[in-house]
């Protein structure tokens, strides 16, 4: 079974290899059962972003494409999909 924290760490490592720093704040599931993550690209904004999140304001990362992923499935495609989404949010395309 894949732990979502393992996915988070793999995403951070993969993006760092590509020169993109991202800082995760939290994962949550909304009332409709859709999973999201909240993150910021600016390390100095972690505290402020965390406060926004605590007040139920999404900071930079609402991502709901995990609805078809189950914890016992391999997570390679999920890591790749999250990385691709983050890169697109900062205007970088994966040309690999």
Regions found by a protein language model. Give the residues of each.
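Negatively charged, low-complexity tracts enriched in Asp/Glu with abundant Ser/Thr
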Residues: 1-31
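Short intrinsically disordered terminal tails
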Residues: 1-2, 13, 17, 61, ...
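Acidic, low-complexity, intrinsically disordered interaction modules
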Residues: 22-88
């Amino acid at each position: 079974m894949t732990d979502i924290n393992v996915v988070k760490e793999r995403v951070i490592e993969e993006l760092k290899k590509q020169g993109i720093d991202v800082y995760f704040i939290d994962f949550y599931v909304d009332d409709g059962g859709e999973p999201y993550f909240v993150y910021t690209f600016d390390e100095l904004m972690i505290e402020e972003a965390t406060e926004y999140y605590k007040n139920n304001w999404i900071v930079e990362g609402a991502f709901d494409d995990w609805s078809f992923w189950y914890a016992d499935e391999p997570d390679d495609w999920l890591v790749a999909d999250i990385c691709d989404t983050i890169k697109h949010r900062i205007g970088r395309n994966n040309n690999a």
